[in-house]
From Swiss-Prot:
Record region (Disordered): 34-54, 205-246
One example of a Gene Ontology biological process annotation: replication fork arrest
Subcellular location(s) per record: Nucleus
Subunit note: Component of the fork protection complex (FPC) consisting of TOF1 and CSM3.
Protein name (database record): Chromosome segregation in meiosis protein 3
GO MF assignments: DNA binding
DNA repair keyword on record: yes
Provenance organism: Kluyveromyces lactis (strain ATCC 8585 / CBS 2359 / DSM 70799 / NBRC 1267 / NRRL Y-1140 / WM37) (Yeast)
GO cellular component annotations of the record: replication fork protection complex
Function: Forms a fork protection complex (FPC) with TOF1 and which is required for chromosome segregation during meiosis and DNA damage repair. FPC coordinates leading and lagging strand synthesis and moves with the replication fork. FPC stabilizes replication forks in a configuration that is recognized by replication checkpoint sensors.
Stretches with biased composition (Polar residues): 39-54
Family (UniProt): Belongs to the CSM3 family.
UniProt keyword terms in alphabetical order: Cell cycle, DNA damage, DNA repair, DNA replication inhibitor, Meiosis, Nucleus
Any Pfam family: Swi3
């Protein structure tokens, strides 16, 4: 056997000859012969698209409304923040602020560890402005603090107990802009009752005086001088009593005393009745009558 025959046998064993006269070995045609990964080999001629390796990225967890509304999100803050963020008088302002900030940093890291605290707050702020669920959750918290319940949250409370304020009876004892029966004191109700009784008595006296005005006779012009003098003197005495009573009432009001009682109201109504009767009768003394009264006073 010649050398050429031996070379032909080797070429047949090792591989096939290419068009340019070079030899390609069998392990180059089949990389798996030597245990190589097919994706690690490079071919000069056209590559099969199915053999292209792509780097797959892990899915990135985003901060969503569902994550913020989960048990580790905002409900956790609403439950534990009042206990963990208490301000102590025995600590300095720096220590209280540090404790306050540390609570929210730990909460943010447990909820979304991929972001820094500053970035987390920015994400929460932007998400809270755009997401409808977070806005509704925030409005429900505000309504709960104000004691306002809407929709299915309203219990079976009679309409009479709700009054006109729309506030539940449990929240009516709190400070409110609306005045209820419980907020008015007993003194105010008593003063209002006295004022009502005084107005009622005076109105009844006016009705009596109006009825008496229609019963006057035409013989009033023929009264004696003694009657005129008596009526004029009585008118002056009545005016003095009215002025004295008015002064006393003003002094009592300025000193913070209560309104007049029932007896004082009766006396005041009698004085008002006499004064109105005298004025309605037009029993005003003339110049001659006043002169006669002065003469009587001199005796």
């Amino acid at each position: 056997m010649s050398i050429d025959d031996d070379m032909n046998d080797l070429s047949a064993f090792q591989g096939n000859a290419t068009e340019d006269g070079n030899m390609r070995l069998d392990f180059e045609l089949d990389p798996t012969v030597n245990g190589l990964d097919p994706s690690m080999t490079s071919t000069t001629d056209g590559q099969d698209p199915t053999l292209i390796s792509t780097n797959t990225r892990k899915p990135r967890v985003k901060l969503t409304a569902e994550k913020l509304l989960s048990t580790k999100g905002l409900p956790y803050v609403m439950e534990h923040a009042p206990k963990s963020c208490r301000i102590s008088k025995h600590k300095t302002a720096y220590d209280n602020l540090t404790n306050f900030l540390q609570f929210y940093q730990l909460w943010a890291h447990n909820l979304y560890p991929k972001a820094k605290f500053k970035d987390f707050t920015s994400l929460c702020e932007s998400l809270g402005k755009t997401d409808k669920e977070l806005r509704e959750y925030r409005m429900n918290l505000v309504r709960k603090d104000m004691g306002i319940l809407l929709g299915d949250d309203i219990p079976n409370v009679p309409d009479m107990q709700m009054h006109d304020t729309g506030v539940l009876p449990a929240h009516q004892g709190r400070n409110s802009l609306f005045v209820t029966d419980e907020s008015t004191s007993a003194t105010d109700r008593g003063n209002a009752q006295y004022g009502y009784e005084a107005t009622k008595i005076i109105s009844l006296d006016k009705d009596k005086n109006q009825n008496n005005d229609g019963n006057y006779d035409d013989d009033d012009d023929d009264d004696d001088d003694d009657d005129v003098l008596y009526s004029s003197h009585h008118q002056r005495h009545t005016n003095e009593m009215l002025s004295t009573t008015d002064t006393n009432i003003r002094q009592h009001t300025q000193n913070g005393y209560a309104l007049p009682n029932a007896e004082e109201l009766d006396e005041l109504s009698k004085i008002t009745t006499v004064a109105s009767t005298t004025n309605n009768g037009n029993d005003i003394a003339s110049d001659e009558e006043m002169a006669m009264m002065r003469d009587m006073d001199t005796f």
